[in-house]
Amino acid sequence: MIVFIGVDLGWYGKPTGLAALHYATSALEQHAITRLEPVAEILDWISQQIGGEDAVVGVDAPLVIPNSSGIRRAERELNAEYRRYHAGCHAANLSRPFAPNVLAFSRALSERGFAHGAEASPRQPGRFQIEVHPHSATVALFGLPRIVKYKRGRREDRSRELRRLRRLMLERLPALDPPFVPDLPRIPLSGNLKAVEDQIDAVLCAYIAAHWWKWGRQRNAVFGSNQEGYIVVPKRGAYSPPSCL
């Protein structure tokens, strides 16, 4: 068995969405989903979910930031391909206030035996961490003309888009490879959406990790490198788009 962990990291020390998927034969199974805040609790949760198994941790946050200013090559390359879909990503450099937190999290994973996996081969044994980008991944996996815009705006609009993302995941992920039937939280009719959003994002991060482990560069793109910073995204065109977006 191999375990895939999705981490929608709270960049500024805020709560983090977490998901754990297990792959034993030919399909993924969702094992756990939660939201935690203290980094020590997050790392303990990851260790408990993995036990003694091999694992890939997909993190929606910069894990390698060598540049003191400007933008990483990974972001420049991703933006060149995905900005037209409104899926570009923000610049990461050492002067950004989130840098200490995200780099400390990556170091903690490294200390626990998780090597950076941008150069790993498909189905390679071991434990790896990879940086992922859910927005561009949904464009690629679901054949979307634009991202699902559930991050900003009025609650009504965000709720509608989050429901759309949930529906796409429920309908499309079982038909992909590896197939996966997610168990996603329902979107609340009122109140804050952030907790549900973080957990759904974490499931996406875990699925991207599984997709990378199974297919490597055959069906995934790697922007950047282990040394300069990297982002793993499924390749566009690997799967047919849904009949109704």
Residue positions per predicted region:
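RNase H-like (RuvC/DEDD) metal-dependent nuclease/polynucleotide-processing core
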Residues: M1-I5, L9-L245
